[in-house]
Amino acid sequence: MTHDQVLDMLKYLGMDNGPEDKVKVIFVPCYLDGKDGILNKHYYDIVLGHDLSVYPSYYEPWGYTPLESVAFKVPTVTTDLAGFGLWVNSLKNQHGINDGVEVIHRSDYNYSEVADAIKDTITAFSVGPHALLAAKPFHHSRHLPAFIFIWDL
């Protein structure tokens, strides 16, 4: 790989996964089918290992990845430019990450605000009462987005 925008930006930002770095970056540029030669795990097995997921979509007609995340009881952050985010915003009694999904407003002109909102959500999740979600089963309210969208086959 001679040129990769993600790797170039990580290098520019000094994110080199040093021992002193509190944030570690995992960048796996492949399809997680269990036979990728890097992680050798399926996508859903990877999702299950997360405490929180972030999908800051710029545009997705629906956005299955945040839905899949909450279906596996992993709280998620998404935007209102994904159909899933718009749908979550339409629900009554949905109050952000407490209910499993934080939807951040995103437009062509608010990149910095989106980045700050994601940072603030992750910080609040990791140091606040939400941090307990990592150690305890996800709240099982039938009104949460994950449980509203369940279907039986």
Predicted segments, located by residue:
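Short, well-ordered loop/turn elements at secondary-structure boundaries
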Residues: 21, 47-52, 70-75, 97-98, ...
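A charged, aromatic-enriched C-terminal amphipathic alpha-helix characteristic of glycosyltransferases
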Residues: 109, 129-153
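Generic secondary-structure transition motif, activating predominantly at the C-termini of alpha-helices
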Residues: 11-17, 92, 122, 126, ...
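A structural signal for well-ordered alpha-helical segments within the folded catalytic domains
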Residues: 41, 48, 112-120, 147-151
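Catalytic binding pocket for nucleotide-activated donors in carbohydrate/polymer assembly enzymes
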Residues: 56-134
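Nucleotide-activated donor-binding/catalytic signature segment of Leloir-type glycosyltransferases, i.e.
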Residues: 1-45, 100-103
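Acidic donor-binding loop of glycosyltransferase active sites
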Residues: 44-61
